[in-house]
Design a protein with these regions (language model features):
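Juxtamembrane intracellular "pre-TM" segments in multi-pass secondary transporters
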Residues: 2-13, 198-235, 346-349, 466-476
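Residue-level signature of mid-helix packing/kink "hotspots" within the transmembrane helices
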Residues: 35, 63-71, 121, 155-156, ...
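Extracytoplasmic gate region of multi-pass secondary transporters
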Residues: 37-38, 229-283, 287-288, 374, ...
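Helix-breaking motifs and short loop linkers at transmembrane-helix boundaries and internal kinks
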Residues: 49, 81, 102-108, 119, ...
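Structural signature of the two symmetry-related core transmembrane helices
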Residues: 84-98, 304-321
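Cytoplasmic helix-loop-helix junction between adjacent transmembrane helices
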Residues: 112-152
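Helix-loop-helix hairpin linking two adjacent transmembrane segments in secondary transporters
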Residues: 147-196
Length: 479
């Protein structure tokens, strides 16, 4: 083999660690970009003289377009140089986010958010394909939990920064997120590019010998992806699950409205509601535990990951319902104060106000249970697909997710607006959110079906990779 000479540290343990850190940071930043505007609905709608429902429609459109573009990004990532695609995609969303910060009208903001959406799809599908090549099947759930956690923390951080910096100027947090995205995109150029199937046990001899894994997707292979039954169930579950997950993007607004209903001004309500929404999402940290449990169950049975996901999804529903309707009676904070003053006051309320504590513990339980979904879904997509198919299948799953999330996002806002005729805020938002939790029920059914089909699909993938290790060029014996 010939090629450009690399320094001795290239591809070493430290370089791989730095690569993963940079890569995970990029994943968190793109989710911060998605989460920022929903946390600033009140100041954005006031500044641009538009309605909360209009902001909801725009947010849903961004989610849907990002999901649509993720299919194309994923397909081309499975065919070509993934590093170039990730770099270009990151610069696109960073540019769109930066220009969004200077929008003076709703139309301008909508236009630049469409540009943002076009770039966000790259991190979703191409990023998944890359990270799956750094992870062995034995520890996929645990490793993917960190990937999913980074995305979740990015959303929390983006929402927190937006609610605090954006209460007075919605452009400030958008500029910050955009500049960080562009900076880490440049750092990504110096990271290690893992070959496809880098951690697959069946391909270790191939990679150790310096042989390339030559297989790439083409259009003719796409029908075969749908003939793999587990793929169908994994894609279908995303549509229903994301109706419910998409509605949850309005939880910060629900709590901002709860604070406003106590008589606080918009700026204080935005900051306090944003702080509470960030604190109440700590249950997502349990995804690490859920991923490890999924790995352990998968070693016992090839149905293990799907079973863990089904139990988590269905078990979370009653906790979400309580969480939405818990009032914030007796919450006392300093009106007009800065974040530095409000944060300790909110934390104090967690231990002294029973209503606030009830909201915290029910959200903790709900999010801890649903945290089983993300890492085990990621791991299952990798388990039942060949390395050159994973970005495309993830893109298709992400499209299904995006359709469901966009619909859940927009319809929850519309439903809450309709309920407001009879129910004052925040009760209209609580009812709207509660209605959409019913979509977790078909999600549980899809995972139950995947538990039956995944063992056969996993064995098929393992057999193909073993043949390809022996006959790298064709995957089949000569003759």
């Amino acid at each position: 083999m010939t090629g450009r000479r690399r320094p001795t540290w290239w591809g070493g343990r430290i370089h791989l660690t730095v690569t993963i850190v940079v890569f995970v940071t990029l994943a968190s930043l793109d989710n911060a970009a998605i989460a920022a505007i929903p946390q600033m609905v009140l100041p954005v709608s006031a500044a641009l003289h538009t309605s909360e429902t209009a902001i909801g429609v725009m947010t849903a459109t961004v989610i849907l377009l990002a999901a649509l573009t993720a299919v194309a990004w994923g397909y081309w990532g499975d065919r070509s140089d993934r590093k170039r695609l990730l770099f270009g995609g990151t610069l696109v969303w960073a540019l769109g986010t930066f220009l969004s910060a200077g929008a003076g009208t709703y139309r301008e903001l909508f236009t630049w958010q469409i540009v943002t959406a076009a770039g966000l799809g790259a991190i979703a599908s191409v990023g998944f394909s890359v990270i799956s090549d750094f992870v062995s099947p034995r520890h996929r759930g645990l490793a993917m939990s960190f990937w999913g956690l980074a995305e979740g923390l990015g959303a929390v951080a983006g929402g927190l920064v937006a609610s605090q910096l954006g209460a007075d100027d919605f452009g400030a947090p958008l500029r910050l997120i955009a500049l960080l995205g562009a900076g880490f995109a440049v750092l990504y150029l110096f990271t290690f590019s893992a070959p496809r199937g880098f951690r697959e046990p069946a391909l270790q001899r191939l990679h150790q010998a310096g042989e390339p894994y030559p297989h790439r997707i083409d259009v003719a292979q796409i029908p075969a992806l749908f003939r793999r039954r587990t793929n169908l169930w994994l894609i279908a579950q995303g549509l229903s699950a994301q109706f419910a997950y998409g509605s949850l993007i309005w939880v910060p607004l629900l709590y901002q409205e709860k604070v406003a209903a106590l008589g606080y001004d918009v700026e204080t309500a935005t900051r306090v509601g944003g702080l509470m929404a960030a604190i109440l999402r700590l249950g997502g940290l349990f995804s690490i535990v859920a991923g490890a449990i999924g790995d352990r169950m998968q070693r016992r049975s090839l149905s293990g990951r799907a079973v863990v996901s089904a139990v988590g999804i269905l078990g979370a529903v009653p906790f979400f319902l309580v969480f939405f309707f818990v009032p914030l009676r007796g919450l006392e904070v300093t009106s007009g104060a800065s974040t530095a003053t409000l944060l300790p006051e909110v934390l104090h309320a967690l231990v002294t106000n029973g209503w606030v504590a009830a909201a915290f513990f029910t959200s903790l339980a709900a999010l801890a249970l649903t945290s089983a979904d993300s890492p085990n879904w990621f791991a299952l997509v990798s388990d039942v697909n060949l390395p050159e198919h994973r970005g495309t299948v993830f893109g298709l799953g992400n499209l299904s997710n995006g359709v469901g999330r966009a619909a859940g996002n927009a319809l929850t806002a519309a439903a809450a607006g309709g309920f407001e005729r009879a129910l004052p805020p925040p009760l209209n938002w609580a009812v709207g959110l509660a209605v959409f939790q019913v979509f977790f029920l078909p999600t549980g059914y899809c995972y139950a079906r995947a538990a039956r089909t995944s063992p056969g699909d996993i064995r098929e993938v393992e057999a193909i990779l073993q043949r390809r290790a022996k006959y790298p060029r064709s995957g089949d014996p000569p003759g």
